Curated annotation (Swiss-Prot):
Stored InterPro entries: Globin, Globin-like_sf, Globin/Proto, Globin_nematode, Mb-like_M
Cell location: Cytoplasm
Function text: May be a globin and may play a role in oxygen transport.
Domain Globin: residue ranges: 1-152
SUPFAM superfamilies: Globin-like
Gene3D superfamilies membership: Globins
Keyword DNA-binding: no
UniProt protein name: Globin-like protein
Molecular function terms, GO-annotated: heme binding; iron ion binding; oxygen binding; oxygen carrier activity
Disulfide cross-links: none
Binding residue positions for heme: H101
Keywords assigned by UniProt, alphabetized: Cytoplasm, Heme, Iron, Metal-binding, Oxygen transport, Transport
Length: 159
């Protein structure tokens, strides 16, 4: 099934209704829960979190760092979903995201892999159906394409 930008955006936005950002305890929990899922299911990627390379889900749960980081990642995903209909703004946000992450020297393949991780998290908390997952993967495919183009144009490793 082929979806247009508006359909993809709408499906992604809908999938995030139960994972809102904010200052209330539940909002903080929403973001922290992503990192608990991440650290439990993708422990090899903890190397990108200096000082937390050996963290368990329990360590993440008690961490103010991951309370804040969880809000940032959820906000980024909300922004991606909400600006997807404006292709140039979407691509600009992708490039800015890449620029902010340069210092971490991330494997360029991780830009697409993130969407597998994120949709897995949404599935694990009951926030995702098959159509929404397909929408996130379509958005992720475009995110990755722009990421790789920007990395290449910046003379950085790319796939």
């Amino acid at each position: 099934m082929s979806m247009n930008r508006q359909e993809i955006s709408d499906l992604c936005v809908k999938s995030l209704e139960g994972r809102m950002v904010g200052t209330e305890a539940q909002n903080i929990e929403n973001g922290n829960a992503f990192y608990r899922y991440f650290f439990t299911n993708f422990p090899d990627l903890r190397v990108y979190f200096k000082g937390a390379e050996k963290y368990t889900a329990d360590d993440v749960k008690k961490s103010e760092r991951f309370d804040k980081q969880g809000q940032r990642i959820l906000l980024a995903c909300h922004l991606l979903a909400n600006v997807y209909t404006n292709e140039e703004v979407f691509k600009g946000y992708v490039r800015e995201t890449i620029n902010r992450h340069r210092i971490y020297k991330m494997d360029p393949a991780l830009w697409m892999a993130f969407f597998t991780v994120f949709t897995g998290y949404l599935e694990s908390v009951g926030c995702l159906n098959d159509q929404q997952k397909a929408a996130w993967m379509a958005l992720g495919k475009e995110f990755n394409a722009e990421s790789q183009t920007h990395l290449k144009n910046s003379n950085l490793p790319h796939v």
